[in-house]
Amino acid sequence: MSSLPRRAKVQVQDVVLKDEFSSFSELSSASEEDDKEDSAWEPQKKVPRSRKQPPPKESKPKRMPRVKKNAPQISDGSEVVVVKEELNSSVAIADTALEDRKNKLDTVQTLKTAKTKQKCAAQPHTVRRTKKLKVEEETSKASNLEGESNSSETPSTSTVWGGTCKKEENDDDFTFGQSALKKIKTETYPQGQPVKFPANANSTKEEVEMNWDMVQVLSERTNIEPWVCANIIRLFNDDNTIPFIIRYRKELINNLDADSLREVQQTLEELRAVAKKVHSTIQKIKKEGKMSECLLKAMLNCKTFEELEHVSAPYKTGSKGTKAQRARQLGLEGAARALLEKPGELSLLSYIRPDVKGLSTLQDIEIGVQHILADMIAKDKDTLDFIRNLCQKRHVCIQSSLAKVSSKKVNEKDVDKFLLYQHFSCNIRNIHHHQILAINRGENLKVLTVKVNISDGVKDEFCRWCIQNRWRPRSFARPELMKILYNSLNDSFKRLIYPLLCREFRAKLTSDAEKESVMMFGRNLRQLLLTSPVPGRTLMGVDPGYKHGCKLAIISPTSQILHTDVVYLHCGQGFREAEKIKTLLLNFNCSTVVIGNGTACRETEAYFADLIMKNYFAPLDVVYCIVSEAGASIYSVSPEANKEMPGLDPNLRSAVSIARRVQDPLAELVKIEPKHIGVGMYQHDVSQTLLKATLDSVVEECVSFVGVDINICSEVLLRHIAGLNANRAKNIIEWREKNGPFINREQLKKVKGLGPKSFQQCAGFIRINQDYIRTFCSQQTETSGQIQGVAVTSSADVEVTNEKQGKKKSKTAVNVLLKPNPLDQTCIHPESYDIAMRFLSSIGGTLYEVGKPEMQQKINSFLEKEGMEKIAERLQTTVHTLQVIIDGLSQPESFDFRTDFDKPDFKRSIVCLEDLQIGTVLTGKVENATLFGIFVDIGVGKSGLIPIRNVTEAKLSKTKKRRSLGLGPGERVEVQVLNIDIPRSRITLDLIRVL
């Protein structure tokens, strides 16, 4: 559907037992007698291919069967029954033979204790492996993945499985409930090899069990290998954050990026929501006494909300009942089953009851039988699977047209906006995501009418398949009975199956479009947050305006407010105000002006460009840039802004925020709610819950990967670090204010509310500037003489005691020696400090050389000599962990990976729309990226659009060729003008290259 590339799915064996559950045909039986009488008939289906059994070994005449320990003794001629004890149960459940005993599912009291009987083939004197429908819960007490209770940090909690990949037989099982070393598939993967999870890790046991395996379904929907999905589920179950997983558990997720990991997380939450909804619906139907075994099976098979709605709709409270239910209540289900099983013995005349409504005439009886058959067909699993597969191969299109409503009810402007979709038709496999969102918006505004069109060939082939295969009577049926069956098929398709398919198609298209829109918003937000900062400059922020003037704010290189003012540039006082601006720039030695892109931006830009061209600010070489002021006005009146800038007018706060967005974009933009930054598409039409979760996750990812200096960062920035929240950030700031700066990372354990898990998640993303600490330590040495030199904090420096505090849970009190650790300024996690020290010893380096050129030279020469894999094996760690250690030791103390991103585009002159000509080549900055094109600011007051068809991989550098096609807000591009529509202020551009 989307033109964007998808990951290739690796073929694996089925995780779920091949258990074709019985069809939905027995739903809502009229009585127990009817069920018993007609239970022998089932729709025709292909007989499953039985597993080949090895011939039983012939026992010797004089030899008794060998009795194994803890196994029942088996006499000659009897079949072996495998006995398996369920967890937390004192009763053993016997597995029945696959060929002889197939029937009923045990009655379930509660969904959480429901277990499906396992089946195995009979074989004398041997215990066969049993198929598992659901993932078993591990019997041993699972401890946390990271060993939170340990006082000393462990180097790593995951190891690469270095053994030979074993090729499993086709009939082997694939489960995640037992030893990962035995059960995880081991195929050749392009990015990595399967990595075993620690034996003490939590299993993938789900709270609500279904008739499908969570790992397998998650793998199918995300196109990610099952062993990776199993590891991801365990990681999320252990409350690990995405930034922590991406950086420190990369080997467990096969090098997935943050977007892919976030997609898996969202899909997992959706599946769990469906399972919980199924559970609650089952409990509700049970209370009403309407539950049957077939209905329970059908509901446990549901994987989407649409499937659950289709199955449970007739059983909702207050429902009048379906036509099929009313026919069953009249006792016609036996006739419907007889038509399929024994049509020669069926006499519909015997069902006539003149005094009963619905049975008074032969026609009423035929209609009742037709409704029952239609319901059976529409709820049969194999039938629905066939029609879904058939639709995937045939032409199914979505159509939209202008709604037939009076012009008074619809705004004419809205009608013009949807001109492209008033006579629109497209195959559902080819339609773009933004088109789906546009059609949905038009439908919500009652401008468009939307329908899904399934070709007639689908219906014809479906009916032919039903008559000849699935629903074919078992013996000769008279013409009048075949007519009823034909009518039932047509009625089932038109009244039940077709609407269900339409709902499923629309829901799937909308869900995919919303997810892609949210992901695009997240990519744009990440690109904007990671804009390269412009440190070390004094900046003037300008919030443009007409009547109320332009608000000015001058900030220092450390973001301190130096001066604020208001000038009126567009009220005939421009020349007089120019002198004031020049005086301010000269007094504060400021040569950079930052203009917000709001009201009067174009006029303000022209004003400064004219003064710069006249060299009015000499001797200063003044330049200016335009930045987005989205969200600045909302932030200026927020409690955070009032706390940060008390007593300052909200309008002037906006000017301060605009200037700081250039000096440190990340630190300023995190103060604003992400959805107000305005770099998305149809953001008000998508799920707000999904949007907020995704954007908050992107902010956490960006802040964590950039890192924060814990001794100078703000509370707002700190709360977005992985593992922290508003309360923990507040406690950290309070501890810092009370006890002074943090000397090392170990002191974080002394902060209230920061437990072992929170410390594990946040420690690697928190930096402690060593220059700042050395200055502080030297001052402390002069006064107390407690700190001497620089030492490494190790487990020996930490004393751990358990102190009980009244009735509260005992909390570990950590007494940390106040010794700086140069590794605390790096991205190396404390759990890997021991490995880092051993690596330093191997290369002959010291902690004093961290981040210096000498360290880089030693590392490079050692790597050339030994190689990464050999070094990792010697240090008993993974290649990914070793790479993090190498990066941390070699990167300079002031390293900021945002410097690789584009900086704001500083200008000295302005160009008008009328000055453009077709073919003109310009440089511009990406303003927003959508699913249909890229908006680029080329400095003419109106953004131009690069259609998505003009953004090809050939025009991108190798580093830019990623899923988002490498274009996001802030990136500089070279474009060519293709078309200019001055009346509509539209500019069409072609991408030449990314600068």
Swiss-Prot record:
Glycyl lysine isopeptide (Lys-Gly) (interchain with G-Cter in SUMO1) crosslink location in chain: K185
S1 motif domain ranges (all copies): 919-992
Biased composition (Low complexity): 146-159
Cross-link named Glycyl lysine isopeptide (Lys-Gly) (interchain with G-Cter in SUMO2), sites: K84, K134, K166, K167, K183, K185, K955
Gene Ontology terms: biological process: nucleobase-containing compound metabolic process; translation
Region (Disordered): 23-81, 120-165
Annotated organism of origin: Homo sapiens (Human)
List of residues that carry Phosphoserine: S861, S964
Name of this chain's protein: S1 RNA-binding domain-containing protein 1
Coiled coil ranges: 258-288
SMART domains for the chain: S1, YqgFc
GO terms, molecular function: mRNA binding; structural constituent of ribosome
Alphabetical keyword list: Coiled coil, Isopeptide bond, Phosphoprotein, RNA-binding, Ubl conjugation
